[in-house]
């Protein structure tokens, strides 16, 4: 008998081999840290009866029967979040199917709720606050660029050619591009671009943005030494240069990547691993960015609105798809309903 048959196989202690209660008992401390650090809400926090004697790390093994937006309805997340109506959970039957567990196609190691991406994130609230401030600008914010940008005779002021921005009485030094005449601050102390109107929080971000308005014939444009492609934005050129240094190669298909984490994400296409799962509908994704884009479909914040039918979308790509397929084609056929009488003479 070969010697390999005499070797005793050791059964590893994994979540797949252990019972579910003990597995969640060992992992509850890690889950508790993720709940606190990443801002997860009450979707995974259950009553203390789940683990007897341990009320702090009491976690549910599936979706909570409480509504996903209970914290937002109670107003614990601020007035901006509590003022929006909570959207309905797309698939509530998942909470009761199979004993309360989400049945996905692949094993999901992390589950995310839409609240963790959007309601706890301040970007949506800041965007709404800036929109309100732009609709009704204060006199102080309007007078600030005039006092700094042109013509004043006081000390420390410059002509309109410099256009340096000021915020709160202090001068913010802008780059060479920002001093070209559009460094004035708009509503809320943000730096506005004089060509396209976009606003930025810092003058350095404005200077980086102004590189995109350069012409390809400009002296500041740079050419890639490998392929000869011309770039007017230096950050974009730096990202392009990485595409010529593909040192991380896939051992399965031979595809090469510039960074190791790109190769790691590519390997999931061979293994079928989808570790990022949606806590609302159970759909799993191989990449976190795809999950983040999917989460916007469950969000109450839909900022992209169709100009024709006033239907709103969470993603701009969804709005563009709506323009191409539904709204404008359907709208063109709608007003053209009296067109068949015009076609009848042609057909005759």
Curated annotation (Swiss-Prot):
Cystine pairs annotated here are: none
* Pfam families reported for this sequence: zf-C2H2 (PF00096), zf-C2H2_6 (PF13912)
Query: Main localization of the protein?
Result: nucleus
Q: Where in the cell is it found?
A: Nucleus
Read off the SUPFAM superfamilies from this record. Answer: beta-beta-alpha zinc fingers
- The segments labelled Disordered in the record are 130-190
According to the UniProt entry, its GO molecular function terms are:
DNA-binding transcription repressor activity, RNA polymerase II-specific; RNA polymerase II transcription regulatory region sequence-specific DNA binding; zinc ion binding
- Report any one BP term from Gene Ontology: negative regulation of transcription by RNA polymerase II
Zinc finger residue extent: C2H2-type: 191-213, 222-244, 248-270, 276-298, 304-327
Residue stretches of biased makeup (Low complexity): 130-148, 163-182
> What InterPro entries does this protein map onto?
Snail/Krueppel_Znf (IPR050527), Znf_C2H2_sf (IPR036236), Znf_C2H2_type (IPR013087)
Residues annotated as region SNAG domain?
Answer: 1-20
Q: Which SMART domains match?
A: ZnF_C2H2
User: Gene3D superfamilies annotated for this entry?
Assistant: Classic Zinc Finger
Q: Which UniProt keywords apply?
A: DNA-binding, Metal-binding, Nucleus, Repeat, Repressor, Transcription, Transcription regulation, Zinc, Zinc-finger
- List all Gly residues biased stretches: 149-162
One Gene Ontology cellular component term attached to this UniProt record is: nuclear body
What's its job? Transcriptional repressor that binds E-box motif CAGGTG. Appears to function downstream of proneural bHLH proteins in promoting neural differentiation.
This protein's assembly is summarised as: Interacts (via SNAG domain) with LIMD1 (via LIM domains), WTIP (via LIM domains) and AJUBA (via LIM domains).
By sequence similarity, the record places it as follows: Belongs to the snail C2H2-type zinc-finger protein family.
Could you give the domain comment from the record? The N-terminal non zinc-finger region mediates the repressor activity.
Q: Which PANTHER family would you find in this protein's record? A: TRANSCRIPTIONAL REPRESSOR SCRATCH 1, ZINC FINGER PROTEIN
Q: Could you tell me what this protein is called?
A: Transcriptional repressor scratch 1
Write down the species. Answer: Mus musculus (Mouse)
